[in-house]
């Protein structure tokens, strides 16, 4: 018989850096999940990513306090900033541009994010990532 789902927890945790301190500890503690077990499993699964890269994770908690988790791809904004070589986006993206990014780099990011994005095709996903870039103050050039 299938386990009864008690709830879902959505977090963004740095790759290889999950520890019991906030935000991980309190979020898992409320549901009664073994925090150290999650931290060890998460760090083992994310060791292929660059240290410190934010990784979205969805944790499914069952009524017997066991859990499973699914990692997603890093946020598009993080990948765009990394590709452009910037620390942060613009506070006023319509008037203040902070950098440029090539369309080919945007397409690579769209292909990376394709597993997590809902879109008809790669072109639609690329346009979505371009919109994210513009809203961060990046100029997309050919």
From Swiss-Prot:
Q: Which GO terms describe its biological process?
A: translation
Report the transmembrane regions from the record.
Answer: none
The family database entries (SUPFAM superfamilies) matched by this protein are listed as:
Ribosomal L11/L12e N-terminal domain, Ribosomal protein L11, C-terminal domain
Q: Quote the Gene3D superfamilies the UniProt record gives.
A: Ribosomal protein L11, C-terminal domain, Ribosomal protein L11/L12, N-terminal domain
Pfam families, A to Z: Ribosomal_L11, Ribosomal_L11_N
Q: Which InterPro entries match?
A: Ribosomal_uL11 (IPR000911), Ribosomal_uL11_bac-typ (IPR006519), Ribosomal_uL11_C (IPR020783), Ribosomal_uL11_C_sf (IPR036769), Ribosomal_uL11_CS (IPR020785), Ribosomal_uL11_N (IPR020784), Ribosomal_uL11_N_sf (IPR036796)
Function comment: Forms part of the ribosomal stalk which helps the ribosome interact with GTP-bound translation factors.
Protein name as it appears in the record: Large ribosomal subunit protein uL11
Q: Which organism is it from?
A: Shewanella halifaxensis (strain HAW-EB4)
